[in-house]
UniProtKB/Swiss-Prot annotation:
This is Rho GTPase-activating protein gacHH. Residues 161-256, 510-569, 609-631, 647-671, 748-786, 861-881, 905-927, 963-991, 1006-1096, 1143-1194, 1425-1482 are annotated as: Disordered. Keywords: Coiled coil, Cytoplasm, GTPase activation, Kelch repeat, Repeat. The gene is gacHH. InterPro entries: Kelch-typ_b-propeller, Rho_GTPase_activation_prot, RhoGAP_dom. The lineage of its organism: Eukaryota, Amoebozoa, Evosea, Eumycetozoa, Dictyostelia.
Length: 1523
């Protein structure tokens, strides 16, 4: 469970240096942050931030619009749908406000709705929670004018923008509120962040004294349980802690309870028979059968007194919490949990629960690690758990002496249990006034301050996150003893405190204890003496914990005197006292292993604790304070995984009045301290629960014992390794540390009467070092006592030193192992390279020319090459200068130079026509690269027939070289010229196997085989590679002998080639085909085809070879008969190869002549085969092209068919949708049209508007009466061409303008402003409407301004033309302002149409405010003074048409109209079917004479909707009639 720190932004100045701000979650992972006090500029701010948590550096500052709230802090914010509601807060001048603002997170616009009802008084530091999806619960806060905090409740309806304050019964405190009035939609509530604020303070470097726990509300003490072991609430004026289970202190008369449910009683653990559950109870939850039994017993009770008494003991309260601010409130499962806060004088830590359904207050008794009193903290709900973080824990939150913390608490409502969570990682700094939000299962901490306001401490550019799914609750056991019936007690960690007395170091990891007896009864007070007994320690297994068990020492201070009433209110002291008092009640389970991680031995340490309490002896439950005497009392100390046996010393050392608690370490007199391991556990309870726990503990014990044995064996092995390493390792630091630890002078623990004491330590490596002990009998016993602090310090040093030793040893082992593996891999790779080069050189005929100098024996070369190492050694003996270094690597491919760099190496004579290998990697082998470079220029000039013939001759030479035979008789000169043989041994592979291996790897990608340049002619000089830095050095002395030897070998080998077998010939053909592959002019894709093409030529060449053999045989017969044999039948070659046929060199000339003819025929055949292959390839290409075109055509047809089907489906769906729209729009008079949208022409619209301004102001029913549709269509077409035809009647032109504006796509007011304007109209926010108008594109804005100006002039003359602002808004509302997607729901469409018309009406009435760049007056359309008269609707007379109100804007602000004219006309309608329309008066349900205010947004304006429908229907009727 670890905190992580995340950057807000890449920008260094993008920090949230505020406190008292608020934040809500918008969507899934976006956070909206607003307001707060910026302590860098020392004033509030109203900046809005958006934090995208799914992105890195996701903090942005959007551009907002609308009516922004003023700079405030201490406010609250609640997210409801896509709107964030902000309420209250404090301004810079310490003045509070009670305004409600809302922020639309979809378009980043602010608005201020006009709420109904009585709002709460101005406040800050309150809490706001969301209930029933659309209601906000406001509780508490502070108002500086009233000089006292608040505890009232207000509920805000976000849909109706209305406030409601539930009333309360003064006698019972019950809140009278009907939950059905707010019509909850579902029982599921969404946890919402509450804004809490507090003053900042610097955390002092010294320890802090936490403030007292608030123990009463409304000056009445909280009822404590009868068994006074619960220290959650302490009375600051009373230090009396009763230890009697049978009685308790007197209580004040509690208030009566109303509407208490049995399920609530069961959930809070109310027992039967007058007994109650203790604050530390670990009783199992009630089963349904137990609840049924409880219900029946409750129903059987006739005395109401017993029931109310049991309810009081359970902690229920019907009175509301005390007044407070800077508290926290979270909603879980229909209940609001209010915790902590500040009441003006004291910090609070009480918890109240408000049942939202019944509106009842409950104050439960909680268990566990109750948080210290705090304010300015935050609380969030994740699942069914409540988490509380940070806050001010001491002093006034607004003072400079306040202190903060960063503790994280968790509360489980089902168990009423608090847990202090221990976290790691990058913890948030202690802070207050921050925000805490739940994102899925994560806790996010943003902003806040850990300093006072005038300190300007700026937090880092980060926010913190904690994943709650990784919480391991196995460490946080729920335990306690209720009435002496529990067998498993868990002592929780002790919190820190300070005083002026000496400090003692205690650790916060205490063991599990088992009660010595099942009850602890005592009738009176008196003296209670704890008798020490022998017990052993049971260590909890934490080996499965994800993080190692790390000790954390906490300073625990003793009081100045034995009287504890000074610090009795401190939770830390009380917890410590309870720990010391309960130490003698429990005995530790025997048979516990010595350590989880291999502890060698346990030191026996006896800790002396003397505590006196002054008071009366023999007092009863209501008497004086009892005296608890604990002589040489037990004290438990558990350092990490080290267990210290607690031995009871019966010697009475009177240290009670020594001025403080004396804590020391000493050993028992006259005894050896040791641990007796028992394999069995003592079971003192026979209940099924005890038996179950006993079995689980026994299994755990056996498992831990087995682990201990295994770890001990590992430790012994490691000690041996350390000893060997100390003697052999060059690192002396580790061995010196071991010697230092092993020396007896490092740790001296003296014992009484020469008693042997053993001290052990453990580390995270589970392998402790045994430490030698010493007995100093000469020291004084009074001066030889080692304090606990000294031993803990020594133990820490030992742990750190040994941990360093283990880390050094592990690092050294890794480095040694890595070095061995690296060397082994390097040697293996080097040997593989050597073997491959040796194998390659043996294949290409260079095995006798060089070898590797094998300094380190390779295990690979002997296995791969057999006796090749012996050949290398012989060659090295003959030529010691000719050596190649072993250092061949990928990074440095250059073969190291020989010892004599500047001397010329004497190379051996190579074979004439050798095949060389060139690697295709970036770092070729240098030796082979030199050979290739020398032969590269010659190969590039050979033609294909020449290379074929050269490859053929080269194959003959290699065949003759690779199969040496010792001749029977050799001249001495020839023997000197021959290369040295290796004791007559033949190569390990034959020629045929070598060439088969080459043929099988003909497609290898590592390189190509090339021919040397010596194959061009038989008389060319041999190019011999050298292996020095100068490749051009050649031994000139051997040139003549080499040429002579070459000519002789060519003749002998050519003749011997005639008698070679067919297999050898086929091999030569394969090699020649392989050599053809190396030509760069052929592309890689055509190589396989070339092989097939040349196969036929090779077959023909084989046939020619057979003919040559027959011809040679005939020539030999003739020569034998004439006696012209050259060299005899046993003539030998240079290489010792015997001519099989015994022929001489006299037939060489005839063979040369036949080879020229062979070349010509081979060339012709090759050309013919190439032509045939080319034709075949073209045919295949054409065939493939046809197949590809066919497949593409088929695929294209499929795609066209699918696209056609899709278009048909879309057309059908579109027709259906259009029919549906036509049906819906036909109801409201809108005619559906499939015509394409017309282009937007600003100049055309301006001309039309100017024409209407000059000719239509006095025309009755302008824009209302329809004209001739044919004329209207003609005018609209002229609009599209840019030349409007304005020679028609004015009604035709006005209707053409309406049709043209309706056909624009996008409309005159673009789609993206539709929802924004609707929200602003709904909230009656003219300022937001004005801001949105100035965001419209410039051309649209100019046209809209001219159009609204025309409507203003028409409405000013409404007494003549009968068209006021409301009638004009009905005409132009759905025309110039419409959504991107039509609304299908009829009720939603009706509401949408009302808002559309209302926006146009606002444009007309607030023309000078909205359309002026610098308005001279504010908006007046929402003042509510000129609401229309609803009684005028439905009358048969035409309502009076008022002139514009005095506040109605005109083009000239100085000109206003103040008179009102009343006219009465009879209503007439025309139904003739002529093409020319007749003048008609306006229906009374259509024309509204009064200005419309908020009536459009209220249910009373349905008549206006009827007017819209009637208007649209009349338009449709007139259009159909004219058509």
């Amino acid at each position: 469970m670890s905190w992580s720190s995340i950057k807000l932004s890449r920008l260094p100045d993008a920090t949230i240096s505020v406190w008292g701000h608020t934040a809500t979650i918008s969507g899934e992972k976006d956070i909206v942050i607003f307001g707060g006090f910026d302590f860098c500029i020392e004033k509030p701010t109203n900046t809005t931030y958006i934090l995208h948590t799914s992105q890195t550096n996701g903090l942005t500052k959007p551009s907002v619009s609308g009516s922004l709230p003023p700079p405030i802090y201490g406010h609250s914010s609640t997210q409801v749908g896509r709107k964030m509601f902000v309420f209250g807060g404090s301004l810079q001048d310490n003045v509070q406000v009670n305004d409600m603002y809302q922020f639309n997170t979809s378009n980043y616009s602010w608005s201020k709705p006009r709420p109904m009802g009585e709002p709460p008084i101005p406040r800050y530091g309150h809490s706001a929670s969301l209930i029933y999806d659309n209601y906000i619960l406001i509780f508490g806060g502070n108002n500086t004018k009233s000089s006292k905090p608040l505890n009232d409740i207000h509920i805000f309806n976000t849909e109706r923008n209305s406030w409601t304050k539930p009333s309360s019964n003064s006698s019972t405190g019950e809140i009278i509120f009907n939950p059905h009035d707010i019509s909850p939609r579902s029982s599921t509530t969404t946890p919402t962040h509450q804004s809490v604020n507090g003053s900042n303070s610097n955390s002092s470097s010294s320890s802090r004294v936490r403030s007292a726990t608030i123990s009463s509300h409304n000056n009445s003490p909280i009822v404590m349980p009868l068994n006074n072991n619960n220290n959650n609430n302490n009375n600051s004026n009373n230090s009396n802690n009763s230890n009697n289970n049978g009685g308790g202190s007197p209580m004040t008369t509690p208030p009566t309870l109303q509407q208490l449910h049995l399920s609530q009683l069961m959930a809070n653990g109310i027992g039967m028979g007058g007994s109650i559950s203790n604050g530390n109870s670990d009783s199992p939850p009630l089963t349904p059968s137990m609840m049924a039994l409880e219900s029946s017993m409750l129903n059987g009770f006739k005395s109401p007194l017993s029931l109310s008494q049991r309810l009081l003991r359970s902690g229920f309260r019907s009175s509301p919490p005390s007044a407070r601010y800077f508290h926290s409130c979270s909603v879980i499962n229909g209940k609001a949990f209010i915790f902590g806060g500040y009441n003006g004088t004291t910090l609070l830590n009480d918890l109240y629960i408000l049942n939202i359904e019944s509106m009842e207050w409950i104050c439960p008794h909680t268990k566990g690690d109750l948080p210290t009193p705090r304010a300015g903290h935050t609380s969030i709900a994740i699942g069914s758990r409540l988490f509380i973080f940070g806050g001010t824990i001491e002093g006034d939150p607004s003072s400079s002496n306040a202190h903060c913390d960063n503790d994280l608490y968790m509360f489980e409502p089902e168990l009423n249990y608090w847990t202090l969570l221990k976290t790691s990682g990058t913890l948030p700094s202690p802070r207050t006034g921050h925000v805490c939000l739940p994102i899925s299962s994560k806790i996010l901490i943003i902003g806040g301050s850990d300093a006072i306001l005038n300190n300007k401490l700026k937090l880092s550019n980060t926010y913190h996150s904690l994943e709650t799914l990784k919480l391991d609750f196995s460490h946080y056991s729920r335990g306690g003893s209720g009435g002496g019936s529990n067998n498993n007690i868990i002592i929780h960690p002790i919190t820190s405190s300070n005083s002026t007395s000496s400090n003692s170091i205690i650790t916060n990891y205490l063991p599990h204890l088992k009660p010595r007896s099942s009850s602890n009864s005592g009738g009176g007070g008196g003296s209670i003496t704890n008798t020490p007994t022998t017990s052993s320690l049971h260590i909890k297994d934490n080996s499965a914990s994800p993080s190692p068990l790390t000790p954390r020492s906490i300073a625990r201070n003793s009081p100045k005197s034995s009287i504890f009433h000074d610090n009795i209110n401190n939770n830390s002291n009380n917890n410590l006292l309870n720990t010391l008092q309960e130490a003698s009640k429990f005995e530790l389970s025997p048979g516990t292993p010595k350590s989880i991680r291999g502890i060698d031995s346990l030191s026996s340490v006896s800790l002396t604790q003397s505590i006196d309490r002054n008071g009366g002896s023999g007092g009863g439950s209501g008497g004086g304070n009892g005296v608890v005497s604990n002589d040489r009392g037990e004290f438990l100390r558990h350092y990490t995984t080290q267990s210290i046996l607690i031995n009871k010393n019966n010697n009475n050392n009177n240290n009670n009045n020594s001025g403080g608690s004396n804590l020391s370490i000493s050993s028992n007199s006259g005894s050896n301290n040791s641990i007796n391991s028992n394999d069995g556990l003592v079971l003192q309870c026979s209940t099924p629960l005890c038996i179950k726990k006993y079995n689980s503990l026994k299994d755990s014990y056996l498992e831990l014992k087995q682990k201990y044995q295994e770890e001990r064996e590992k430790r012994l092995e490691l000690e041996k390794e350390l000893e060997r390493y100390r003697l052999s390792s060059p690192i002396t630091s580790a061995s010196s540390l071991v010697d230092t630890l092993s020396s007896p002078n490092n740790l001296n623990i003296n014992s009484n009467n020469s008693t042997t004491t053993t001290t052990t330590t453990t580390t995270t490596t589970t392998t402790p070092i045994p430490l030698s002990t010493s007995n100093n009998n000469n020291n004084n016993n009074n001066n030889s006592t080692l304090t606990v602090q000294d031993q803990v310090t020594t133990s820490k040093q030992i742990l750190e030193i040994y941990e360093d030793i283990y880390n050094l040893w592990g690092y050294y082992e890794k480095r040694v192992k890595w070095k061995e593996n690296t060397e082994k891999e390097a040697n293996q790779q080097l040997e593989v390279i050597k073997s491959k080069i040796d194998l390659f050189t043996s294949m290409v005929g260079l095995e006798n020319h060089f070898s590797f100098n094998d300094d380190t024996k390779s295990c690979c070369s002997e296995n791969i090459n057999g006796d090749h190492n012996q050949q290398q050694q012989q060659q090295q003996q003959q030529n010691p200068q000719f050596q190649i270094d072993d250092n061949i690597s990928e990074t440095n491919s250059q073969i190291s130079e020989p010892a004599l760099i500047h001397e010329t190496l004497t190379p051996r004579k190579s074979r004439e026509n050798s095949v060389h290998h060139s690697r295709s990697v970036s770092n070729p082998i240098p030796l082979l690269s030199q050979i290739v470079k020398q032969s590269k220029s010659g190969d590039s000039t050979l033609t294909v027939p020449q290379q074929l013939h050269s490859s053929h001759n080269n194959l003959i030479q290699l065949a003759s070289i690779s199969t040496p035979q010792k001749p029977p008789q050799q001249p001495q000169q020839q023997q000197q010229q021959q290369p040295p043989q290796e004791n007559g041994k033949e190569p390990s592979k034959s020629t045929q196997k070598i060439f088969k291996l080459l043929i099988s790897k003909k497609n290898r990608a590592s390189g190509h085989f090339k021919l040397s340049s010596s194959n061009e002619s038989s008389n060319s000089e041999e190019t011999t590679p050298t292996f020095s830095n100068n490749p051009n050095l050649i031994n000139d002395e051997d040139d003549d002998s080499q040429q002579h030897q070459q000519q002789t070998n060519i003749g002998s080998n050519s003749i011997s080639n005639i008698n070679t077998s067919n297999s050898t010939t086929s091999l030569s053909s394969s090699v020649s085909s392989t050599s053809l592959q190396t030509q760069e002019e052929f592309e890689a894709s055509e190589r396989s085809k070339q092989k097939k093409r040349l196969g036929k030529a090779l077959k023909q060449m084989i046939n020619k070879d057979r003919q040559l053999k027959e011809t040679a045989a005939a020539a030999l017969a003739v020569s034998n008969s004439n006696g012209n044999l050259g060299g005899g039948g046993g003539g030998g070659s240079i290489n010792g190869t015997t001519n099989v046929s015994g022929n001489g060199a006299n037939n060489l000339g005839g063979l040369v002549l036949t080879s020229d003819k062979e070349k010509e025929k081979l060339e012709k055949e090759r050309e013919k085969s190439e032509r045939i292959e080319r034709e075949k390839q073209e045919k295949e290409r054409e065939k493939l092209e046809k197949e590809r075109e066919k497949s593409e055509r088929i695929e294209r047809e499929k795609l066209e068919k699918a696209e056609k089907e899709r278009l048909e489906k879309e057309k059908i769906e579109k027709e259906k949708l259009e029919k549906k729209h036509k049906k819906i729009k036909g109801l409201f008079g809108a005619k559906s049209s499939n015509k394409e949208s017309l282009p937007f022409r600003r100049d055309v619209i301006e001309k039309v508007i100017n024409h209407l301004r000059e000719n239509s102001l006095d025309t009755e029913g302008i824009f209302r009466l329809s004209g001739n549709m044919e004329s209207v269509r003609g005018i609209v077409k002229s609009f599209a061409h840019g030349e409007p035809n304005l020679s028609f009647e004015v009604h035709n032109i006005s209707n053409a303008l309406k049709h043209y504006l309706r056909s624009l796509d996008p409309p005159l007011i673009p789609y993206e402003f539709f929802l924004m304007l609707l929200d602003a109209r709904k909230n009656e926010d003219a300022e937001t409407i004005r801001n949105i108008f100035w965001k419209i594109p410039s051309d649209n804005r100019v046209v809209l301004t001219l159009l609204v100006d025309l409507m203003v002039k028409i409405s000013e003359n409404s007494n003549v033309n009968k068209m006021n602002s409301k009638n004009l808004s009905i005409v132009f509302g759905p025309t110039i302002l419409k959504p991107r997607t039509p609304t299908l729901d009829r009720m939603a469409l009706m509401t949408e149409t009302q808002l559309q018309c209302g926006i146009i009406q606002t444009f007309i009435e607030d023309f000078h405010y909205i359309f002026s760049e610098f308005p001279t007056s504010g908006p007046k359309s929402f003042l509510g003074d000129d609401d229309y008269d609803s009684s005028s609707f439905g009358s048969n007379n035409t309502p009076s048409s008022h002139s514009p109100h005095s506040s109605s804007p005109t083009l000239n602000p100085a000109v206003t109209t103040t008179t009102t004219t009343t006219t009465t006309t009879n209503t007439t309608t025309t139904t003739n079917t002529t093409t020319t329309p007749t003048s008609a008066t306006i229906s009374p349900n259509i024309i509204q004479t009064n200005n419309c205010d908020s009536a459009l947004c209220t249910p009373t304006t349905l008549s206006s909707t009827a007017a819209i429908i009637q208007s649209n229907n009349n338009n449709r009727t007139d259009s159909n009639r004219n058509n």
